[in-house]
Amino acid sequence: MDEKRNDPEVLLRVEHLCQYFKSKGHVNRAVDDVNFEIHKGEVFGLVGESGCGKTTTGRSIIKLYDITSGNIWFKGQRICAGTQSYVDRMSACRKKTADAVRALKRESAADPAKKAANDAKIASLEAELKASLAADREEIRAARYDHKHSDREYADKLVADVKAEYLPRLEAAKGTPGEAALQKEYRDRLRVAKKTKLITQIQMIFQDPVASLNPRMTVREIISEGLVINGIKDQAYIDEKVYEILELVGLVREHAGRYPHEFSGGQKQRVGIARAVIMNPELLIADEPVSALDVSIQAQVINLLNELRAKLNLTILFIAHDLSVVKYFSDRIGVMYYGKMVELATSDELFAHPLHPYTKSLLSAIPLPDPHLEKQRTRVIYNAIADHDYSTDLPSLREVAPGHFVRCNDAEEKRYRKELGL
C-alpha cells in the first residue's frame, strides 16, 4: 500500500470503480471508471439525473454489490476489489501474443532462413506472456483476499486494542472487589471486538423510508438490530442506546414500541437515520434521504444530518439529484452522467464556475424563487453528441484548476482553462 493511500485525512478512496450488470447478452455499464476521495469530516455530494449510477456507486461502496473492477479503500485498507480488469487484460495479452506468434511462424514458413531468429522471438514472447499472466494472477489473488478478509484484519486490530487497554487494568485489579465487574466488561468488549466488521463503520440511509423499514418489527427492534448482530446481549444497555438515539434524531422514547406504519414519512426517515447512527459509523451514505419528503420536512432532515455531523464527527456521502439542496449541505460535489464522473469541485467553485456542459444544464434547471427572475431563466439543453467531438481525442477526468476536475479531451481542457482565465 503506498503512502498516498495511508493519508490520514482521506477516509474513503474510490479508484477506477466499475459496476457492470449483464442482461440478455447486453452489458449495462452502470458505473464506469469512477474516481474520487472523501476526506474526514466533510460532506461529499454526488449528483446527477435518475439512472446516472450515483446510487449504484453508494451501494457498491457498502458492498451490497460485488464490484466488477476497481478498488475501494476505507481507512487505508482495501475493502472492495474487482478482478474483471485483470481478466480482460490477461485475455488481451494472450490474444496479442498468439497473433504475434502466428505471424512469426508464417514468416518462418515463407523464409526458412529466418526460422532460428523467429523461434528465439517466439520463446521471448511466450516468456513475457507467462510473466505477465503470473503478475495478473497474483493481483487477482491479492484482490480476492482483501475483499474477503478485510473485516478479519480489522477485528484482529480491535481485539489487540481491547487487550492492551484491559490487561494492565485487570492485573492491577486482582483481588479487589471490582475485579469481577471488570472481567465481565473485558469479556463483553472482547466479544464485540471479535465480531466487529470494518464495513460496519459505513452505514447507509436509504431513499425510501417506507420500503427500508420492516413492517413486522418495532422501532426498538429496527434500531437495535445492528447491535444485536454485533453480539451485544445486554438488554438494558440496548434499550438505553435506543432511547438515546431516538432523542438525538428528534423522536421520543415512547416511539420505541411502535411500528413503522404509525409514523409519517419524515418520522420514518428519522428512524432510518437512527438505525444508521446507532452503530457509531465514521462514514454515512445518505442515498437521496429527502427526495420522498415534503419541502418543509426536507429542511428538517437536512438540518438533522448537519447536527449529527457536528455531534458525532460524521463524514457523509450525500447522494441527490436536487442541486439546490446539495449546494448548501456539501463541501465538495461530484457530477455523474451515464456512469461517468464528468465534473468534481468544491461546492462554491462548481456553482460559480461550472465547466462541463452537463453541469451547466443541471444548474440551469434549478428554479428561482423570484417570479421575475424565473421568467428570465434560460435553460441549457445538453446534447452529448453535439457538445463533444471525441472521434480522435478521447476524454479523461483532468484537473483543469486546483481541486477542479472535468472530464474532457485536450481541446476542451484548453477551452476550459481559458474560461477560468488560466
Predicted regions and their residues:
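Short catalytic/signature loops enriched in Gly
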Residues: D2-L11, V27, A81-V87, E107-S108, ...
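The feature captures the beta-strand-to-loop junction immediately N-terminal to the Walker
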Residues: V47-G48
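Conserved ABC transporter NBD signature motif
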Residues: G70-A81, V162-Y166, E171-A173, G178-Y186
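Conserved ABC ATPase "signature" region
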Residues: Y237-E254
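Conserved ABC ATPase signature
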Residues: Y259-F263, Q267
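A short, proline-enriched helix->beta-strand linker immediately N-terminal to the Walker B motif
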Residues: I278-E282, Q298
